[in-house]
């Protein structure tokens, strides 16, 4: 949340908020998607997208400049071939966008941060890119009724003004990659080796 608030405040500078929490549960009805949407106060809900499409890089970049929170709902639906594009989008801090029927590009700051949900535990396909995702197992139904947006965002703003760190250190990134191993999808070769030699 600190990374999101820093991104919205324009504090991220040359480094964007490149980490996305992914809420994971094999059980339906845990309120994962509802929680993601509930993070946005009602006055900002129009800046929330819950169906990020990775079919057009230009469209995705426009969303980075115009939205506040992009939910990669059902994260496992994204093909492995789209992961390089997603990782690139997540690290972008400035965007060069050309609107339809215009000849010149405009440089716009990135505003949006990412979040995601999944019903599968084997959702990460690139072990080198797992530091971009903070996979969190949801073990029970999330109570979305008690979110006090004014308090949350006031606290985030205060922490940022006091200089709170909103990025991971190299050591924390290493711990994150280790944590995410339980959410890693095995390749076909790994599956065959595991089946033959366990």
Regions found by a protein language model. Give the residues of each.
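Short amphipathic alpha-helical segments and helix-helix/interface helices
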Residues: 36, 86-87
């Amino acid at each position: 949340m600190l990374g999101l608030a820093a991104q919205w405040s324009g504090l991220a500078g040359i480094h964007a908020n490149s980490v996305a929490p992914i809420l994971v549960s094999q059980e339906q009805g845990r309120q994962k998607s509802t929680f993601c949407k509930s993070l946005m106060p009602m006055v900002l809900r129009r800046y929330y997208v819950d169906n990020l499409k990775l079919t057009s890089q230009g469209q995705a970049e426009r969303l980075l400049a115009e939205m506040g929170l992009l939910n990669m709902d059902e994260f496992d639906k994204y093909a492995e071939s789209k992961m390089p594009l997603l990782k690139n989008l997540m690290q972008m801090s400035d965007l060069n966008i050309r609107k339809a029927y215009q000849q010149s590009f405009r440089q716009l700051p990135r505003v949006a941060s990412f979040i995601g949900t999944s019903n599968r535990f084997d959702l990460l396909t690139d072990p080198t890119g797992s530091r971009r995702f903070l996979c969190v197992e949801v073990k029970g139904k999330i109570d979305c009724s008690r979110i006090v947006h004014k308090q949350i965002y006031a606290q985030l703003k205060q922490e940022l003004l006091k200089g709170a760190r909103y990025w991971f250190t190299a050591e924390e990134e290493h711990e994150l990659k280790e944590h995410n191993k339980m959410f890693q999808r095995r390749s076909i070769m790994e599956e065959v080796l595991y089946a033959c030699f366990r």
